[in-house]
């Protein structure tokens, strides 16, 4: 935590030292700019005695032909006078900037129009402008535009400019939505410090909400476990839990509302030729801006940010879930933007012309890259080819940001959302590098633990010396580990580790890819031991679960999910006061895995009496089916003999519903119970739903659930 704050302080100081300024989208809906464009557009519709082919450009007549320019300046002045009482000429002088900008598109020399010239044209028009010009076929002198015409055109430009501004505001509101969610999360998280959680979680109403809308899985009984939509393999993914689902629903609803409200339609169709044309343009702008404003949130929720986790208590799993769904809504907004602009171009017979514009080409490139990125982010790709998913995700995201930058380059706005996103992304990468350097690059000892040569028992232990004694990991936290072998040094995997003071310990069951490569390398080494330098990035995850503030603690682990609960049991057993009781339940397929943590498990043997250890062997026949069963039995007997002296041994899968029920019943009214679970996806989903049901069955009991399962 202190390392994160130190790093953030350094970054803020660096930003101030170099006076870094971000791009900023200026407000579009100004009376001055509306008056300039409204008057220019109307005057441009009139016929003037001027050959516009001499000076090409949409506004060439009003910028190059003196009578038209005089008319323009008078129209601007009168439009401002209509709205500003009393008129002090300040707004008129400020409008000169918009005049220069408009005329600079015709010729750069017009960007130097002086204030003296501007007033001279106004005075000339005020003295000589014609009031009645309807019968004149070709104008050669300045005219006075009537008030009704001025007002109609200004309202038309106001409608367009207002939509650009309110779209940015609504986009910011979507960001504030998650700020509010974060503040609420901080409140509940901080309640553990002052004991307020006891009052909150003893409330029947609060537990009713938690049991129905916060803790359970959502719609299906799967959250950690992968879910197949319509039972189709391609649409494999992870469902949010109930709380995440409600937060995502609120965000989606807000996005739909902001897409649907506050449109001003010009009844006279002065800028666009129909109501349909108007609406498609306004919707295109609204959806595109909303898509841009979500870029920073999408990046923030991918960051391995221990600081946000520390403040809110929200897990990285939830951040990733928010990242996915915000990304999907952003893709939806971008798709609406693309389709609406295409329809707008078709309605106005400008599709071929638009296709030649650079901003249009980069818009097509952006949505194409986004669609490819979305397809390559499908759950089946992440699950089966994670490294491919990860690197293509990064490359395509950077390409997408580049295309977006080029897309809005000529529009003088909305670049700040890209810059902020890239800054967050870059600073997060710097923080991660700094984090790795803090641990340095120790030489770890990798030991093969499979003495029976049974494929079921394949595992290896990693013992990592700590060069930096100020580096500490707390129970349940995880680190990303890089094995610095020339062929795989860039790959990393997250593992829960046990910090033993001078060293860190973890046990890995090799699957495929990186862990299989390292395991095979260990097998080829002498005596099944290998020295290999590693890099550690972390620790990440909850650093303050406050389990020491609970009266009773139920630790549930399954399979390779043992390290976190075991570390909690070891550290908390040293506390002479709380918790009053600790139950550690381990469900494993066979005892061989326990040998990897033998010394840590046996530490509980000498701990104070209130640590209750229970081990359940869920596949008793796994040993006897092996070709060298006798050797395995001897190997297993080594750890099992030690365990039987202080732990309960069961030979069947435990009924976790009964285990949790008994823990609640044995907790006296008024005492608090924490249930911590880490294990296979099926287990954690089952325990999550069971705790939710028990909350409804025991609404006045203080029960909290902590899930340490991690998935990406």
UniProtKB/Swiss-Prot annotation:
Listed transmembrane segments: 168-188, 245-265, 288-308, 329-349, 361-381, 388-408, 417-437
SUPFAM superfamilies the UniProt entry points to: Ferredoxin reductase-like, C-terminal NADP-linked domain (SSF52343)
Keyword Transmembrane helix: yes
Species per Swiss-Prot/TrEMBL record: Saccharomyces cerevisiae (strain ATCC 204508 / S288c)
Signal peptide limits: 1-17
Gene from which this protein is expressed: FRE6
CDD domains: NOX_Duox_like_FAD_NADP (cd06186)
Principal subcellular localization: membrane
Record keywords, A-Z: Electron transport, FAD, Flavoprotein, Glycoprotein, Heme, Ion transport, Iron, Iron transport, Membrane, Metal-binding, NADP, Oxidoreductase, Signal, Transmembrane, Transmembrane helix, Transport, Vacuole
Family indicated by similarity: Belongs to the ferric reductase (FRE) family.
Residues involved in heme 1 binding: 323, 393
Vacuolar topological domain: 18-167, 266-287, 350-360, 409-416
Binding residues annotated for FAD, in chain numbering: 493-499
Residues in Ferric oxidoreductase domain copies: 287-411
Residues modified by glycosylation: 89, 112, 124
Location within or outside the cell: Vacuole membrane
Disulfide bonds, paired cysteine numbers: none
Catalytic reaction list: 2 a Fe(II)-siderophore + NADP(+) + H(+) = 2 a Fe(III)-siderophore + NADPH
Molecular function in Gene Ontology: ferric-chelate reductase (NADPH) activity; ferric-chelate reductase activity; metal ion binding
Record's note on what induces expression: By transcription factor AFT2 upon iron deprivation.
Protein name: Ferric reductase transmembrane component 6
Membrane topology designation: Multi-pass membrane protein
Residues the entry annotates as binding NADP(+): 538-541, 678-679
Cofactor: FAD
Binding site for heme 2: 337, 407
PROSITE patterns the UniProt entry points to: FAD_FR
Domain of life: Eukaryota
């Amino acid at each position: 935590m202190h390392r994160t704050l130190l790093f953030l302080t350094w970054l803020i100081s660096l930003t101030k030292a170099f006076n870094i300024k971000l791009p900023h989208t200026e407000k579009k809906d100004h009376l001055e700019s509306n008056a300039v464009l409204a008057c220019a557009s109307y005057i441009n519709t009139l016929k003037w005695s001027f050959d516009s082919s001499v000076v090409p450009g949409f506004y060439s007549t009003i910028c190059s032909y003196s009578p038209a320019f005089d008319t323009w300046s008078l129209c601007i002045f009168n439009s401002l006078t209509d709205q500003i009482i009393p008129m002090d000429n300040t707004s008129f002088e400020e409008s000169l900037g918009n005049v220069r900008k408009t005329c600079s598109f015709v010729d750069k020399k017009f960007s130097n129009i002086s204030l003296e010239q501007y007033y001279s044209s106004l005075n000339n028009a005020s003295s000589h402008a014609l009031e009645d010009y309807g019968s004149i076929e070709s104008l050669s002198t300045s005219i006075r535009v009537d008030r009704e015409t001025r007002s109609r055109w200004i309202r038309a430009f106001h409608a367009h400019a207002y939509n650009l501004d309110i779209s940015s505001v609504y986009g910011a509101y979507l960001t504030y939505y998650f700020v509010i969610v974060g503040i609420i999360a901080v409140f509940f998280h901080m309640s553990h410090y002052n004991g307020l959680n006891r009052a909150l979680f003893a409330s029947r109403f609060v537990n009713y909400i938690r049991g129905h809308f916060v803790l359970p899985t959502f719609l299906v009984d799967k959250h950690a476990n992968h879910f197949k939509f319509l039972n189709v393999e391609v649409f494999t993914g992870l469902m949010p839990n109930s709380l995440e689902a409600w937060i995502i629903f609120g965000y989606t609803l807000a996005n739909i509302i902001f897409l649907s409200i506050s449109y001003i339609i010009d009844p006279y169709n002065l800028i666009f030729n129909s109501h349909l044309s108007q609406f498609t343009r306004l919707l295109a702008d609204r959806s595109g801006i909303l898509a841009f404003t979500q870029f920073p949130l999408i990046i923030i929720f991918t960051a391995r940010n221990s600081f946000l986790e520390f403040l809110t208590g929200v897990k990285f799993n939830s951040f990733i879930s928010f990242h996915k769904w915000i990304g999907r809504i952003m893709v939806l907004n971008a798709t609406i933007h693309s389709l609406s602009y295409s329809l707008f171009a078709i309605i106005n017979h400008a599709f071929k012309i638009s296709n030649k514009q650079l901003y249009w080409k980069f818009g097509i490139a952006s949505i194409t890259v986004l669609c490819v990125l979305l397809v390559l982010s499908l759950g089946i790709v992440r699950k089966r080819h994670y490294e491919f998913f990860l690197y293509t995700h990064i490359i395509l995201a950077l390409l997408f940001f580049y295309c977006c930058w080029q897309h809005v380059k000529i529009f003088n706005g909305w670049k700040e959302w890209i810059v902020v996103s890239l800054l967050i992304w870059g600073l997060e990468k710097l923080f991660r590098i700094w984090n790795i350097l803090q641990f340095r690059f120790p030489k770890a000892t990798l030991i093969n633990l499979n003495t029976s040569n049974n494929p079921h028992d394949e595992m290896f232990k990693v013992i990592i010396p700590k060069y930096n004694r100020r580096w500490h990991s707390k129970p349940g936290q995880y680190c990303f580990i890089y094995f610095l072998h020339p062929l795989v040094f860039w790959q990393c995997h997250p593992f829960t580790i046990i910090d033993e003071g001078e060293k860190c310990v973890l046990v890995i069951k090799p699957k495929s890819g990186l862990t299989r490569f390292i395991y095979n390398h260990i097998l080829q080494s002498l005596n099944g031991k290998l020295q290999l330098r590693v890099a550690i990035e972390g620790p990440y995850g909850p650093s303050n679960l406050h389990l020491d503030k609970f009266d009773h603690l139920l630790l549930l682990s399954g399979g390779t999910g043992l390290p976190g609960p075991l570390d909690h049991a070891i550290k908390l057993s040293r506390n002479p006061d709380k918790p009053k009781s600790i139950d550690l339940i381990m469900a494993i397929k066979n005892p061989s895995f326990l040998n990897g943590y033998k010394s840590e498990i046996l530490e509980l043997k000498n701990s104070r009496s209130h640590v209750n250890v229970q081990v359940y062997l869920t596949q008793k026949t796994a040993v006897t089916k092996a070709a060298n069963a006798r050797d395995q039995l001897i190997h297993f007997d080594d750890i099992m003999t030690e365990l039987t002296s202080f732990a309960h041994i069961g030979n069947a899968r435990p009924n976790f519903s009964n285990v949790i029920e008994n823990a609640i019943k044995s907790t006296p009214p008024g005492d608090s119970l924490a249930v911590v679970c880490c294990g296979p996806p099926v287990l954690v989903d089952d325990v999550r739903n069971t705790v939710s049901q028990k909350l409804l069955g025991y609404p006045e009991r203080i029960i909290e659930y902590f899930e340490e399962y991690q998935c990406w």
